[in-house]
């Protein structure tokens, strides 16, 4: 499989709902998940290429010839672009971390959500007790609340708050894509370009979540040490640890083996169906609990496209085909 990186620059506010409570409208995360991205790409494929374009994308995902990661942050510095990975879910059990690290650094370590690719090996060695790791701040933007108004013909406008995220000028998000053929990557690149015009996440009708594709890079064509590391680790299915890059869930028949020796946290995935043809009334998708990106397993699983609504005019799927990064002890 060939892997590519697509780097996105957001032009304004974005709303990436948490999907884990009734208050998700009032706050925002700093990134979006692969299932959100896949749904948005499906809508774009349908708009651009009709039902055949949609079916092509669904088939590629279903047979595993197209893989998507969650979005992850990047930060441009004087030395180039730094890419980040989700912090692995591993137990900090070594005496080196507990005794030799200042209390302030220990607290900062616990709060970390992202690890720079450049120092990922150092971080992993610190978990194994082989070295110390000094955490660095990982802010890529700021939360910003905005007041919107719900307007109807029968009542006065009702104000409500929307949580939003604004990226710093030198920051954004990137996505890793795995494809078997170049034509698949070209197709996805077209969808990303068009999707950026309408936006991703919530409240796109009022302009949230719009982005531009800043760069598309094939990992095997790059001499950037970060991307060389990613290329090798993505292909390393035999490594003793597998870092999950896609918030997803194994199939029932994969569950027992996957969860053995895994360390993870669960995240709730829900939401309403964004389709004018599925049902005349708003319809909620089936709620599922996924392994959050950053989970560490001892083997890879295949996942699936899960059917999350069955009573409408067409099937509705939730993406759950994982991408893993092989990590050596």
Q: Model-predicted segments: where are they?
A:
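Conserved active-site/ligand-binding neighborhood in enzyme cores
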Residues: 1-329
